[in-house]
C-alpha cells in the first residue's frame, strides 16, 4: 500500500496495515496535457509590455483588497500591474465596485479585445483561463488563506514558475503547502507587513520553481511505476 501522505500512512498503520511505502504524493505530478487555448495576439502584446508584480489567484471576498493594498505599496513604475483571478468569477462586477474608491483603472478580461494601455488591474472574469495568466507573474498569492476557508490548491501557480504566497488558513492542502515551504517554493505570512516585506525581498529574484517541481514529480512517478510493476 502506498499512502499519499504521512497522515494517511499513520491512519493505515493504526488500522493494522503493515506493508506501507511512502512513495510521495501523486498530486504533485502533472500528467495532463498543456491547454491549447492561448492568448490573443493583442493580449500577448499587452502582457509583454507590462510587468505583473503580483497575481491574486482564486481569491475570495476581502482578499482582493489585500492584493491591492500590497500592489499599491510595491508598485514602482506605471507599466507594473496587478492581475486578479477570483475563485468565483461572477463576483467580477462586485469586485470592481468594491475597488472604486481606489481610483485605479480596472480592465475585465471579457472586454480584452481592446485593452487599455494605462490599466492598473487586469481582472479575469471567465472560467478555465487562469493558467494563461499565471505564467506572467513571479509571485502569486493563493486565496482562501486569509479568510477561514482552508486555502486553494497552489500547484498550478508553481507549475507556471511562480513563488506562492499565502495566509495561515491552508488546512485543506496542509501537506502540499508544507512540502512547498520546505522546498522554499511557498511562503506563509501572518500579517500584512510580513507579506509586504517578503514580496519586496523576492520581487527581483528568479527561482525556477517549475523545474524543481518537475524533478520531484518525476521521481515520485518513477518510484510509483516501479512499485506497481511488482504486481503486474
What is the predicted function of each stretch?
Residues 1-232:
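Nucleotide-activated sugar donor-binding and catalytic core shared by glycosyltransferases
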Amino acid at each position: 500500500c502506498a499512502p499519499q501522505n504521512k497522515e494517511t500512512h499513520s491512519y493505515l498503520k493504526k488500522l493494522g496495515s503493515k506493508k506501507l511505502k511512502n512513495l510521495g504524493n501523486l498530486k504533485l505530478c502533472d500528467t495532463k496535457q498543456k491547454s491549447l487555448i492561448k492568448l490573443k495576439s493583442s493580449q500577448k502584446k499587452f502582457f509583454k509590455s507590462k510587468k505583473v508584480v503580483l497575481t491574486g489567484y482564486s481569491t475570495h471576498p476581502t482578499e482582493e483588497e489585500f492584493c491591492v493594498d500590497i500592489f499599491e505599496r510595491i508598485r514602482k513604475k506605471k507599466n507594473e500591474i496587478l492581475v486578479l483571478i477570483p475563485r468565483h468569477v461572477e463576483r467580477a462586477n462586485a469586485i470592481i465596485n468594491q475597488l472604486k474608491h481606489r481610483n485605479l483603472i480596472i480592465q475585465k478580461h471579457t472586454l480584452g479585445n481592446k485593452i487599455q494601455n494605462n490599466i492598473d488591474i487586469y481582472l479575469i472574469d471567465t472560467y478555465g483561463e487562469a493558467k494563461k495568466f499565471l505564467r506572467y507573474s513571479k509571485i502569486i498569492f493563493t486565496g482562501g488563506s486569509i479568510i477561514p476557508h482552508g486555502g486553494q490548491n497552489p500547484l498550478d501557480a508553481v507549475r507556471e514558475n511562480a513563488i506562492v504566497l499565502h495566509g495561515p488558513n491552508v488546512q485543506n492542502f496542509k501537506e502540499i503547502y508544507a512540502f512547498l515551504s520546505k522546498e522554499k517554493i511557498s511562503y506563509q505570512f501572518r500579517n500584512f507587513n510580513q507579506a509586504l516585506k517578503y514580496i519586496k525581498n523576492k520581487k527581483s529574484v528568479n527561482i525556477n520553481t517549475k523545474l524543481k517541481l518537475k524533478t520531484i514529480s518525476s521521481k515520485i512517478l518513477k518510484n510509483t511505476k516501479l512499485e506497481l510493476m511488482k504486481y503486474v
